[in-house]
């Protein structure tokens, strides 16, 4: 199931643990977007305590996952368990060095079994293909995910690199903001963008609310407080706007 579906189910008060017999359910897989720590809590509290919860990250283009679940390893709250078989995965900083415990670019350092070999109707020297995956670091597949490898071997995805915000020169993954805003009952969904403003970048947050809710000053203050407390003052949006809907890609992201 998608991480967004789990978040929506939690907000709707859905508790399969109390309405269904789930003794045969052994594992639950989450994909589509990063599963928040609160999403892990919801599954273990209201769906099935102790179930093997597998978040994952990959892509249609590779027909696979770079990082995913492993039935033989423990599951840590908010983390993906490990790298896929045949995937030489790492997180690179801006200098192209592998780092642990720091945020950076998710990369694969060697070819892998399901790696596409090119694009249809590309140039002879594969300009589009190389621009899509190999411009970031020389001969290293850069997948476009803003990620972190934890000290215990787990992985955290903070969102797509092309959606990373940079207010005051500090890189912020949009998922870091969404994880906090999802806690607000009045908010159905949201999207954060960076806007050039007075020589810097400011964060603008668009929110879709429940029908009876209004983005008044009190609700804005509560959202800002939750973001400030759960993330940092840097994550707090400079501007919030209420919208009727949020644009999506063809596959619902």
Task: Please provide the spans of the model-predicted regions.
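Hydrophobic beta-strand positions
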Residues: 90-91, 148, 247
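Conserved ATP/PPi-binding loop(s) of AMP-dependent carboxylate-activating enzymes
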Residues: 83-84, 97-134, 172
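AMP-binding/adenylate-forming catalytic core of the ANL superfamily
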Residues: 112, 139, 144-235
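AMP-binding/adenylate-forming catalytic domain of the ANL superfamily
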Residues: 229-253
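Glycine-centered tight turns that cap/initiate beta-strands
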Residues: 24, 186-189, 245
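General small-molecule cofactor/ligand-binding pocket signal
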Residues: 54, 90, 240-243
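Gly/Ser/Thr-rich phosphate-binding loop
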Residues: 8-75, 88, 95-96, 120-124
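Short coil-to-beta-strand transition motifs
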Residues: 80-86, 141
């Amino acid at each position: 199931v998608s991480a967004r579906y789990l978040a929506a189910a939690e907000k709707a008060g859905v508790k399969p643990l109390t309405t269904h017999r789930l003794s045969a359910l052994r594992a639950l897989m989450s994909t589509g977007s990063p599963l928040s720590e609160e999403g892990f809590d919801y599954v273990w509290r209201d769906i099935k305590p102790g179930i093997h919860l597998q978040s994952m990250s990959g892509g249609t283009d590779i027909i696979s996952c770079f990082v995913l679940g492993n039935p033989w390893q423990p599951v840590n709250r908010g983390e993906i368990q490990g790298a896929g078989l045949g995937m030489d995965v790492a997180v690179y900083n801006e200098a192209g060095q592998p780092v642990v415990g720091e945020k950076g670019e998710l990369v694969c350092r060697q070819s892998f079994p399901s790696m596409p070999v090119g694009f249809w109707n590309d140039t002879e020297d594969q300009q589009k293909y190389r621009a899509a995956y190999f411009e970031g670091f020389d001969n290293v597949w850069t997948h476009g995910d803003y990620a972190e490898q934890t000290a215990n071997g787990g992985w955290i995805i903070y969102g797509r690199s092309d959606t990373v915000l940079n207010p005051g020169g500090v890189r912020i993954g949009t998922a870091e903001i969404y994880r906090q805003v999802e806690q607000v009952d009045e908010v159905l969904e949201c999207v954060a963008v960076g806007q050039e403003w007075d020589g810097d970048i400011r964060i603008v947050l668009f929110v879709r609310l429940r029908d009876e809710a209004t983005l008044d000053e009190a609700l804005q203050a509560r959202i800002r407080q939750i973001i400030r407390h759960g993330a940092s003052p840097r994550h707090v949006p400079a501007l919030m706007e209420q919208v009727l809907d949020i644009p999506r890609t063809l596959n619902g992201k």
